[in-house]
Amino acid sequence: MWIRALLCIAMLAIAAGVALAARRDWTGSAACGTCHPQQLAAWQTTRHAMTRDRFPAKPEGRCLACHGTGEAPAGPAIAVEVGCEACHGAGAAYAEDDVMRNRPVARVLGLTDTSTPTARAAVCSQCHARQTRGTVFDSSAPVHPVKSVSR
């Protein structure tokens, strides 16, 4: 009974956008890449992966809210990069293979829904709410396009 109550509280907090992650809840992009190597390789070629190059020194917490992965500006950033978990949510709770394969459970445990263009736009618009450097943000463009391997 208490497990059901805990899951309900977690679902309500996630739906309300409340940050529940602690430093130990973040796995880092390299950990995600152990099961998703094509996505990791594709992401590594993007501006999201190269965020650190934009800052001459350690960025302020307010910058890391969009240019980092973690709890910034309210808490610590785990990386100066827009890593997997910056968009998909802190992964420690849902990273196990059997959990990741069960999407409803993974979502309850923190996996952010990015399965539709509307869901992706909602995630992306948290940082891409305005035009940057004269470039209009295209929410329909793939973030880390994976090229299919022809045989």
Name every feature range the model reports, one short phrase each.
Residues 5-15:
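Bacterial N-terminal signal peptides
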